[in-house]
Regions:
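Short beta-strand element of the conserved SAM-dependent methyltransferase core
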Residues: 10, 119, 358-360
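A residue-level signal for beta-strand positions that form part of recognition/binding surfaces
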Residues: 89, 116-118, 357
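Class I S-adenosyl-L-methionine
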Residues: 94, 325-408
Length: 408
């Protein structure tokens, strides 16, 4: 119900939700918490009402979708709430779905209730959240990466018996977000295209702006051990939450900097070649809804930052930006900013909505067209032919969805 309260008191969020669902009209139905009406009866009433309100006579063939805000949860438990002076309200909760989402690792017993842990940021509660799978503790199986190859590994389950909820940890093998899958796919695809290889002592230097729950860097470390990951997070409260509730751990090859992201990127841009970044990922939510952006902060898609980001990249560097907006005008303006700085631009639409990833290569030439992308997809498939994990299949599917960025 809190979600509905936040939605209804806002002057912009309902319209943003309408645009985000790519629909012309939105009907919000708020039910008393003590109601005992069956879901199918509610839907029947909604359809009868829509028939009376809808324009035209072809309502039977209209595309009407009903989304339930709370009915999908069998159980929801609040674990922790904190208000940060930098980030605002942060809430952690465990949920059990009536119908769990797909992609659950086959080592998880799906005949029992599956618990998911979520982080919610108050400033973007309607739109954004990170969600992780809780499972018995798993151990990583270390595989030596061969010279010149991007070697992937998957963690294996431990031999421990069923654990209580207190013994459960976040399973970083599980990827719920289509955007996370897309980032991994794009990183692998353009690494293959640029013929970036790794050898002893040469890791792919990766910087992620924005920690959140820490799921992206932990997932990338598990699946792509050839990355040397640095995370830039401005809020120490967010780091503490990620460690305490989402099993985030710093280790060799994964370090967090509590500092200003703009300052960090500018210093890398002005530094020598040894400090340059191979892959720069921007994954931060907007704190100002009036900008028309849900992700990222407006300054991260403005020309001054994009110029600094380009200068911070190595010769074969790649910039990945998580980009979410409900407004076509804002999208066009952001595209225009990118086109002023980069020539090789690509995008991937994820999660069947207005979520998008923008990929920008530092090198302006040679120009990469659809034919070159198709060849890179084939090369990626060959490089992963000995990996049988579900995430590999998804990476290959997503890589084929990456297209040249166009305004129209």
């Amino acid at each position: 119900m809190q979600l509905f309260q936040n939605l209804l008191v806002s002057t912009t969020r309902p319209w943003a939700l309408v645009r985000g669902q790519n629909t012309a009209r939105l009907l919000i139905v708020a039910l008393d918490a003590n109601h005992n009406v069956l879901v199918n009866e509610i839907e029947n009433d909604i359809f009868r009402l829509i028939k009376q309100l809808a324009p035209g006579d072809d309502i039977e063939n209209a595309n009407v979708e009903v989304t339930h805000a709370d009915v999908r949860y069998k159980q929801k438990k609040s674990l922790y709430k904190v208000t940060s002076t930098l980030t605002g309200p942060i809430a952690i909760e465990d949920v059990i779905y009536f119908n769990p989402p797909g992609g659950i690792p086959n080592t998880v017993d799906t005949s029992k209730d599956i618990i998911f842990r979520r982080i919610r940021f108050g400033r973007t509660e309607v739109f954004a959240q990170s969600e992780a799978l809780l499972a018995t503790q798993v151990q990583n199986k270390k595989v030596q990466a061969k010279k010149g190859k991007l070697r992937m590994v998957e963690s294996q389950p431990s031999d421990s018996q069923e654990a209580s909820s207190g013994d459960m940890k976040v399973d970083h093998r599980y990827v719920r977000s289509g955007l996370t899958n897309g980032m991994i796919s794009g990183l692998l695809l353009f690494s293959i295209h640029s013929k970036r290889t790794t050898s002893a002592g040469r890791l792919v230097k990766t910087v992620i702006i924005g920690l959140g729950a820490g799921l992206l860097p932990m997932c990338m470390r598990n699946y792509i051990p050839t990355l040397k990951i640095e995370v830039v997070e401005s809020d120490p409260v967010v780091l503490n939450v990620a460690k305490e509730y989402f099993s985030f751990e710093e280790a060799d090859g994964l370090k967090v900097h509590i500092t200003d992201a703009m300052k960090f990127v500018k210093e890398r841009a002005e530094g020598n070649n040894s400090s340059k970044i191979d892959v720069l990922i921007i994954e931060v939510d907007s704190s100002d809804s009036s900008s028309g952006l849900i992700c990222p902060e407006a300054e991260f898609v403005e020309e001054p930052f994009l110029l600094a980001a380009k200068d911070s990249l190595s010769d074969k560097g790649l910039l990945i930006v998580k980009f979410i907006t409900c407004y076509p005008g804002v999208r066009a303006a952001v595209y225009s900013n990118f086109e002023k700085v980069f020539s090789n631009l690509f995008c991937l639409h994820a999660d069947k909505g207005f979520n998008e990833l923008i990929f920008a290569l530092k090198k302006d030439s040679p120009f990469i067209g659809e034919e070159e992308l198709a060849q890179a997809c084939e090369a990626l498939q060959r490089s992963l032919e000995h990996n049988s994990g579900d995430w590999v299949k998804q990476a290959l599917v997503d890589s084929k969805k990456i297209k040249q960025l166009r305004k129209s």
